[in-house]
Amino acid sequence: MRKLRGGQTKETRKQKQERREENLKIQQQLKTIVLPICGVFLMCIVVYVFLKTRPRFEEL
């Protein structure tokens, strides 16, 4: 049993199961929300750097 913060009571099976479910939910949100946002942000940086560093040909 795990001791809860700020108290003498210990964690019950139900509380432990709820905590596990919350952790799984957070991991799922990480995969569906945070990683795609980071991917889009990274792609924006790559495109910006590409556009700023490409050689520009002036017509003669």
From Swiss-Prot:
Its main location: membrane. It comes from the Eukaryota. It holds the Pfam family DUF4519. Residues 1-21 are annotated as: Disordered. One of its GO terms (cellular component) is membrane. Residues 8-21 have a biased composition (Basic and acidic residues). It is a single-pass membrane protein. It is found in: Membrane. Keywords: Coiled coil, Membrane, Transmembrane, Transmembrane helix. Residues 10-33 form a coiled coil. The chain crosses the membrane at residues 32-52. PANTHER family: SINGLE-PASS MEMBRANE AND COILED-COIL DOMAIN-CONTAINING PROTEIN 4. Belongs to the SMCO4 family. This is Single-pass membrane and coiled-coil domain-containing protein 4 homolog. It comes from Aedes aegypti (Yellowfever mosquito).
